[in-house]
């Protein structure tokens, strides 16, 4: 197991104990183990990270996933963060196209190609490529789909954090986009900010919404993008074709607009001030429109009614999205009274028995146990290490250190128990966690006993980044403690 990089195929053929030992070394702060795990999803030079080592996403490069993983590791893998930033700028939308949902300034959702560095992708991945291209468009041997609302503000936020840590020289780098045009990174980031501003200004709620342009596109265009990702409390699907404002996306929009002002991306000081003022409007509208006083929790989002498109409805499902809002500055910048009103109840709910499991946070509260007949991709019988870690970061940001440590420990212990970096874990309504999904472990209970219909992807990029970030934070804490005594 020497070396800095482990091909995904070799990882799959390792024994459980071999994989577990690499994860164990990672948690001890072994940088060789960091590189070995990160090497599972490192794409060809210049392409950042593949989404996973699994059959569905092993040759897919997602904007959101790559940006969030890069942000997790920005303090100790700045080279990767820079690569992701430049790739997103390279693929940034330039024209308006309903089929691919491309818009000027918009950051991509999913990029696929039939070849990388003259190597053809496997046949199974080619089949996925052609199936998606038939509905989303494609240019010959490449496919770039833009059906996501959150990748664009996340991109701006990532650039802002990179500049804060490493200086603004990166803004002067020249990127050649996929059509051969040359622009500075600063120009690309400014175009992304203008996309955010335009969409917030045009929203009746003055929030950042998604609404698909292509009826074959993803109906829900935030990270919970499955068909049951956004359900009302009575089980009715949120109306995807009427515009939806998702709660956590408003945190990204707020951070991006604040970053735009700090980076001075406006043509003058008045425009920079406008970015900051618009962020405040997003903050006020989020707290005013989405808070459910009777539940002492934020709604999952807002949608319209198909019967009355002018009417606003709260998506009153109790979901993890509200806790993910903690990992932004939107709530952090409130006054003390507002913080007490909003933050403490959210923390109490997310750390309570309706959400907390041995593997992390359920994506939907047990209050909605009957919302679906089986364990849906983003429901109450799954926990995603990515979401659990995002919530842990938010808890730490707001001073809930013990709670953050608890969640990080659940992410770490689940990786050790499973000897894998899974996309999610199935957790039944009694709290039993299924840690193994591989056919070579016949002693494990079958997936249907947990109400699931599919296996999680192994080697998920943002599960790996979460584990590495947890390991690195612990390593630095040990180092600082040692040198302080």
Language-model features: locations:
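Hydrophobic or amphipathic alpha-helical targeting/insertion segments
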Residues: 145, 152-172
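Core register positions within helices of long alpha-helical scaffolds
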Residues: 72, 158, 256-259, 263, ...
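Extended acidic/polar, glycine-enriched regions
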Residues: 1-2
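Heptad-repeat amphipathic alpha-helical coiled-coil interaction surface used
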Residues: 156, 163, 254, 258-261, ...
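Extended, well-ordered alpha-helical scaffold segments
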Residues: 14, 19-30, 77-91, 169-199, ...
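Extended glycan-interaction surfaces of carbohydrate-active proteins
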Residues: 7-61, 87-140, 201-244, 284-383, ...
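Alpha-helical support elements that line or immediately flank enzyme active sites
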Residues: 65-95, 320-334, 388-401
């Amino acid at each position: 197991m020497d070396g800095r990089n482990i091909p995904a195929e070799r990882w799959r053929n390792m024994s459980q104990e071999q994989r577990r030992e690499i994860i164990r070394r990672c948690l001890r702060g072994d940088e060789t183990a960091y590189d070995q795990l990160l090497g599972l999803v490192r794409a060809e030079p210049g392409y950042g990270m593949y989404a996973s080592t699994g059959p569905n996403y092993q040759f897919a490069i997602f904007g959101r996933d790559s940006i969030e993983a890069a942000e997790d590791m920005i303090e100790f893998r700045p080279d990767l963060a820079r690569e992701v930033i430049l790739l997103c700028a390279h693929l940034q939308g330039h024209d308006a196209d309903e089929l691919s949902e491309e818009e000027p300034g918009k950051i991509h959702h999913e990029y696929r190609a039939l070849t990388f560095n003259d190597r053809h992708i496997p046949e199974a991945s080619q089949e996925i490529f052609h199936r998606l291209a038939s509905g989303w468009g494609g240019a010959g041997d490449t496919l770039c789909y833009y059906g996501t609302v959150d990748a664009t503000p996340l991109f701006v936020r990532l650039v802002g954090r990179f500049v804060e840590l490493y200086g603004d020289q990166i803004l002067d780098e020249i990127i050649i986009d996929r059509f051969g045009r040359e622009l500075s990174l600063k120009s690309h980031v400014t175009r992304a900010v203008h996309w955010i501003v335009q969409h917030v200004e045009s929203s009746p709620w003055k929030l950042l919404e998604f609404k698909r342009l292509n009826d074959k596109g993803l109906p829900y265009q935030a990270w919970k993008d499955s068909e049951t990702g956004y359900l009302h409390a009575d089980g009715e699907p949120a109306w995807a074709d009427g515009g939806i404002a998702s709660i956590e996306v408003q945190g990204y929009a707020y951070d991006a607009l604040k970053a735009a002002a700090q980076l001075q991306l406006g043509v003058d000081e008045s425009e920079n001030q406008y970015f900051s003022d618009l962020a405040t409007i997003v903050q006020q509208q989020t707290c005013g429109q989405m808070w459910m006083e009777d539940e002492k929790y934020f709604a999952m989002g807002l949608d319209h009614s198909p019967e009355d498109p002018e009417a606003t409805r709260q998506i009153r499902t109790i979901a993890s999205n509200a806790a993910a809002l903690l990992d932004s500055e939107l709530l952090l910048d409130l006054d003390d009274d507002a913080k007490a009103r909003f933050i403490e109840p959210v923390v109490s709910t997310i750390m309570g028995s309706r959400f907390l499991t041995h593997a992390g946070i359920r994506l939907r509260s047990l209050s909605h146990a009957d919302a679906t007949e089986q364990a849906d991709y983003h429901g109450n019988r799954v926990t995603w290490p990515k979401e659990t870690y995002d919530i842990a970061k938010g808890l730490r940001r707001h001073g809930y250190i013990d709670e953050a440590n608890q969640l990080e420990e659940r992410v770490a212990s689940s990786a050790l128990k499973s000897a894998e970096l899974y996309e999610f874990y199935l957790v039944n309504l009694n709290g039993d966690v299924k840690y193994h999904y591989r056919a070579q472990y016949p002693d494990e209970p079958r997936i249907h006993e947990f109400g699931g219909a599919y296996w999680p992807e192994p080697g998920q990029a943002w599960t790996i980044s979460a584990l590495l970030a947890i390991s690195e934070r612990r390593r630095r804490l040990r180092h600082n403690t040692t040198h302080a005594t």
